């Protein structure tokens, strides 16, 4: 039995079983499917004169005469070359009689009839292991001692004069081959077997059948006939595999019929060979990197196993990359064919996707990341890494992926987590570097500031705190960001990209905390032209998410329905309602009804949370979240209906309009009419005039985090229904019960019992009921709005979850559990400051106790709240904490929008935020 080719007539074996492979000639197999436009050049070099053993050509790289990992010839690392394992003569598989007949070849690592060592047969169902054929051990390296010199000579000659086969075909033929090279296979396709040199360093070979150019009876992209590919390992992997024997294994594949995500993959292995099942193989030896994916994981693309090789010589096996959007275009299909009776050389052909048409992304080995499939790393190596044509050195351990420029160079202003939109407010006493000018004609200037460790940790843990660095014109009272074209900024030797936008109003500031470090920090400003007209400033800013601000407004600025109705009646009695013309277009007195649109004037979509400014005299509302998003970057804070100033702290959420929107939320009405008695009815939509709405307003992120039905009490909805047309009775909502952590998984909820808001929001007019009276709870407790202490408590905003709200700015450490060790030691109980408002509430102020202190290790995850916080909070002021009853989903009611306070609020020198920073 000839174990090396069990399907061929047995030949008399040599003493070591290699006699049949010594100088057996293999003719050139011209494929009938070779394109007419192909060109093949084959060069054969003679001169191998001393072949003492048959292994000289069958295994030209016998490494016994070379130390493990040593290089026997220039350009080849550790005994590897283009002829690492040339096609053993006679071992090419030729499909005879179509796809129904195939020769079963020896496995990839199989050698045969050598005692000792471990076998390296693959686990294909069509291979020897799958047919129950005996596996064979690898030959000991000592058998190659006498052939070392001849092997080196043969390999050197073969490598130096390796044949180059280039294929240039027409564009359509090229694309046709690439698209059909997988689908043309039959279930009985032959699997080619190749052989590595024995006893020498071993690397990952190309499994037969996995290379589109190495499949028997099939045309590869190079246009060559059915020549089996030689498994070529990377030269850089030589030292790691020197002297090792690898265990038997098989390349893993997905289970039969399992779909494989197509990311640059033409077809999954199980689809290419429906009748063949790849075994779930293991990995290489334990001290090597894992090449095969774990069981159950889909393998990489077929071309990846053949596509990732190191260059043999700069001019011979250079990696070829065609320009393309992403991924690798390096797809060498190294094919070795026995040419003649005494030279087992071969030609190396490279398929260049970019030669004759648009490039096609072909990922290299390791494969491109697939969902659920970690990219297997390449084996570490001390030799030269893979070199691209642009001479960029790429790590041999990492996949050669080319992400977009945006991911390679993220904008420093992109500090928004989870795509959350954030508002930006200056912090009182938060200026780190006072506004300064650059010296005239000074090209490079350095500006140093210090960050204490505690402040740095707080900045890192609080996503709503940032260090903002911006430039503005010295005459701009609003200090709008404006970067001169010649300004470049780097922080701690890290260059930052400045977003200047299309016009001067779209310039964005830089946010530096991601490049800062504890202690000394240096901002370097480089200019090529004079910028004396501009000022630079570094300040601490509070950047609450839109979600948290939205929640705070819902809790503090939700005007009761009675208030809204009173306001509407008063406007009717006065005879004028600006901005809302009557049905006949008249704005005069004695209006019978007012037509109000249910669409937001910003987005032209159905309003979700109706709001307007405190000074607005119209009933028409805008969508609150859209308004906040509109003012994120450069807030003008003007009402889109009447263009009056509508600052954040003066916004009002109209509970009356909200009830109407909830009542008709499942209808297509676009307008309603409201009469002087506040009775309302929808305006029927005319079918001939109804056009599907297209949002032609600003493109805003729609991240609805509020369930409006939970904002209104059943009595309010009953009142809305009574004032409505009465077409269908409104089913009242169930009274909200006291919230529990399991019922409302909101962040940081510590309020379990019935109660009311910590402080009633200042009412718009002294005669209208405020929010605390509307909630019908116990008297409100005082609220302590202190910005410096709030900046030392962690933000609890989390990614957007349906029906879940993030709290607003966390302002009171006693009410906000957070990392206790982050509070500044010198901060004691601080008196609260009050928002400037036309009619402030005369609630008394009770300073609360000092926040809890303790190591950061006390942090624990509370599954009920979904946030990190101390296991138990027993600080002062917690025992009498009231809870919400009106808004069960909205927790942390102690957080008023106090971060909106102007910088001239009363300050306390003991907790001046500026003391947290050390300026030079």
Swiss-Prot record:
Stretch list, region Disordered: 1-22, 243-262, 289-308, 317-408, 732-920
Positions contributing to Zn(2+) binding: 616, 618, 639, 642
Polar residues compositional bias, start-end: 334-354, 782-796, 842-855, 906-920
Metal-binding listed as a keyword: yes
Zn-finger (SP-RING-type) residues: 585-671
Modification sites for Omega-N-methylarginine: 111
Biased composition annotated in UniProt, kind: Pro residues: 366-379
Keyword line: Isopeptide bond, Metal-binding, Methylation, Nucleus, Ubl conjugation, Zinc, Zinc-finger
Keyword Methyltransferase carried by entry: no
Covalent link (Glycyl lysine isopeptide (Lys-Gly) (interchain with G-Cter in SUMO2)) residue numbers: 402, 457, 692
Cellular-component GO terms for this entry: mitochondrion; nuclear replication fork; nucleoplasm; nucleus
GO molecular function, one term: transcription coactivator activity
Pfam families registered for this protein in UniProt: zf-MIZ
Modified residues (Asymmetric dimethylarginine): 245, 262
GO biological process: positive regulation of transcription by RNA polymerase II
Compartment(s) where it occurs, according to its Swiss-Prot or TrEMBL record: Nucleus
Functional note: Increases ligand-dependent transcriptional activity of AR and other nuclear hormone receptors.
Subunit structure: Interacts with AR, SMARCA4/BRG1 and SMARCE1/BAF57. Interaction with either SMARCA4 and SMARCE1 enhances AR-mediated transcription.
Protein name, UniProt field: Zinc finger MIZ domain-containing protein 2
The species this protein was found in: Mus musculus
Gene: Zmiz2
